[in-house]
Swiss-Prot record:
Part of the Tol-Pal system, which plays a role in outer membrane invagination during cell division and is important for maintaining outer membrane integrity. Pfam families: PD40, TolB_N. Residues 1-28 form the signal peptide. HAMAP family: TolB. The gene is tolB. Keywords: Cell cycle, Cell division, Periplasm, Signal. Gene3D superfamilies: TolB, C-terminal domain, TolB, N-terminal domain. It comes from Nitrosococcus oceani (strain ATCC 19707 / BCRC 17464 / JCM 30415 / NCIMB 11848 / C-107). One of its GO terms (biological process) is cell division. It is found in: Periplasm. Belongs to the TolB family. This is Tol-Pal system protein TolB. Disulfide bonds: none annotated.
């Protein structure tokens, strides 16, 4: 039997009820706890950067180390285990670092330039080849130090793995809190991928659902109930300007962007039944894509732009189907388990993250679209809203804990697990930026 709360959330009919869970209101950044999967990580030594002049407001080396640790690919050595603190390449005794088992070594310095500006230098060395792999210097204002640390972590990650890092990306999510007088407050927030620098995009006394990033990362589409009914908005993050793109009678929900950013796939019930539509954002033209008496919902646009995967109960239970954007017959994709929903494409288009339900439990799973192999990744029981990292290595999702709704992340091999919580608030509806 399908899970009523999850399925009602999918179709949008009972979205208000989904969010009626009390929680105290304390605004805070997301805190991230690595809960598993560091055993196979590559040891790397990140020496605290030397400070010259005034003390910088950010510990650049610590931010880099935390980024690399969260990736699950690297295990920064504890600071107390560092046998020395070389300031320059000539200070490095490579054999000492090899004895510690470190594969790489990062050194650097932060130089105060005055007028609230800093120069940051860093070098990455291969311990076994005894050579520099990369080195850079940057000048940034004090407020830009943390972002620069993320950039350096991206560069280190790419140099050592050959893959793009994700440390300068962002996450969108929705929090719900209870004010002192008992009223609920919903907030759509955007934060750095490590949970820092959160800022509020929208506050409302009514639920906010389904944030979706535009392909260029400059806009968010989302569903708001601020006018006491569902409505889909698109909002510019830089200016805060927004426009309503779907406010028809009935359900307006589940926006997802086309890869070129020119269209939105939506769920509308303006003709009586929840169906998938495509809205051209430039012309306003609306095209109905599905025609079925069942519930069709949760569209996910394929990265090549040619098809859309969606959830439908046309076979009796929620399963995933794929349909060409030009229209035609939908093909069923999932057959393993009684419930498969909430598809999210990997950036390469070869895999889907989804919610797999069986025997009353709902887990994050990955479906290989070529082999049709389904791999369940999580052991938590009430998972929702999977969203791939832009490099395809991690999946962000919402789940439940004894303290309420939290976010979590899992690597696509299931090895690395993280938990993201915000003190005092329910946290739901995650979306990872491009």
């Amino acid at each position: 039997m399908m899970n009523t709360r999850v399925w009602c959330k999918i179709i949008g009919m009972l979205a208000l009820l989904v969010w009626l869970v009390s929680s105290p209101s304390v605004f805070a950044v997301l805190t991230i706890e690595i809960t598993g999967g560091t055993e196979a990580a590559l040891p790397i030594a990140i020496v605290p950067f030397q400070n010259e002049g005034s003390t910088p407001p950010e510990n650049v080396a610590a931010v880099i180390a935390a980024d690399l640790a969260r990736s699950g690919r690297f295990a920064p050595l504890p600071e107390e285990d560092l046998i020395s603190r070389p300031r320059n390449a000539s200070d490095i005794q490579f054999q000492d670092w090899r004895r510690l088992g470190s594969e790489g070594l990062v050194i650097g310095k932060v130089i105060s330039l005055g007028a609230d500006r800093y120069e940051v230098r860093f070098q990455l060395f291969d311990i076994y080849k005894e050579e520099q792999l990369v080195g850079r210097r940057y000048q940034v204002p004090a407020a830009g130090l943390r972002h620069l640390a993320h950039q350096i972590a991206d560069l280190i990650y790419e140099t050592l793995t050959g893959e793009k890092g994700i440390f300068t990306t962002h996450i969108a999510f929705v929090t719900v809190s209870r004010a002192a007088h008992g009223a609920k407050q919903y907030s759509l927030q955007v934060a750095d991928v490590d949970g820092h620098n959160p800022h509020t995009i929208l506050r409302s006394k009514e639920p906010i659902l389904s944030p979706a990033w535009s392909p260029d990362g400059t806009q968010l589409a989302y569903v708001s109930f601020e006018r006491r009914r569902s409505e889909v908005f698109v909002q510019e993050l830089r200016t805060g300007q927004r426009q309503s793109v779907a406010s028809f009678s009935g359900i307006n929900s589940a926006p997802d962007w086309s890869p070129d950013g020119g269209k939105l796939a939506l769920v509308l019930s303006k003709e009586g039944n929840p169906e998938i539509y495509i809205r051209d954002l430039a012309t306003g033209r609306l095209t109905r894509l599905t025609h079925n008496t069942a519930i069709d919902t949760e569209p996910a646009w394929a990265p090549d732009g040619g098809s859309i995967v969606f959830t439908s109960d046309r076979g009796g239970r929620p399963q995933l189907y794929q349909i060409p954007v030009s229209g035609g017959r939908a093909q069923r994709l999932t057959f393993d388990g009684a419930y498969n929903a909430s598809a999210s494409f990997a950036p390469d288009g070869r895999r889907l993250a989804l919610i797999h339900g069986d025997k009353g439990q709902f887990h994050i799973a990955v479906l290989n679209l070529q082999s049709k192999e389904l791999q369940v990744l999580t052991e938590t029981r009430m998972d929702e809203s999977p969203s791939f990292a832009p490099n395809g290595r991690m999946i962000l999702y919402a789940t439940s804990s004894p303290q309420g709704g939290v976010l979590a992340a899992v690597s696509t091999d299931g090895r690395v697990r993280q938990r993201l919580a915000q003190q005092g608030d329910e946290v739901r509806e995650p979306a990872w930026s491009p």
